[in-house]
């Protein structure tokens, strides 16, 4: 019996949500609303992350070179490879952006 009551209450809640959704005015603007950050902010954050990775790798390598305790060669190599991969990815993004810019500039007006 309680399952029937729960089902009825669920159906009533769903109908109430449907009525609320139908009563709200719909947005008719032609320009979509942008949520979040824009592309330049995201690109800047990515560049800063790559820079931080490069600097952390360099600091770890320097610590290993001077013989600081607690710095392992495997950690240095992993950090170095992470920095290398992130820089290569950033380079590829740059290449794609330059290519897209050139394609747009070559389009006839």
UniProtKB/Swiss-Prot annotation:
Give the UniProt record's GO annotations in the biological process aspect: bacterial-type flagellum-dependent cell motility
InterPro entries hit by this protein: FliE
Per UniProt, subcellular location reads as: Bacterial flagellum basal body
The protein's predominant localisation is other
**Which is an annotated GO molecular function term of this record?**
cytoskeletal motor activity
- Which UniProt keyword terms apply here? Bacterial flagellum
- One GO cellular component from the entry? bacterial-type flagellum basal body
Q: Which family does it belong to?
A: Belongs to the FliE family.
The entry's protein name is Flagellar hook-basal body complex protein FliE
**Which gene underlies this protein?**
fliE
């Amino acid at each position: 019996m309680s399952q029937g009551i729960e089902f009825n209450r669920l159906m009533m809640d769903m109908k109430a949500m449907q009525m609320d959704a139908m009563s709200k005015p719909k947005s008719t603007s032609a320009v979509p609303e942008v949520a979040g950050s824009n592309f330049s902010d995201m690109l800047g954050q990515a560049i800063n992350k790559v820079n931080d990775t490069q600097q952390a790798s360099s600091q770890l390598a320097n610590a290993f070179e001077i013989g600081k305790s607690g710095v392992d060669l495997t950690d240095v190599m992993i950090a170095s490879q992470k920095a290398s991969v992130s820089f290569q990815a950033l380079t590829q993004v740059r290449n794609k952006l330059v290519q897209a810019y050139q394609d747009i500039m070559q389009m006839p007006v």
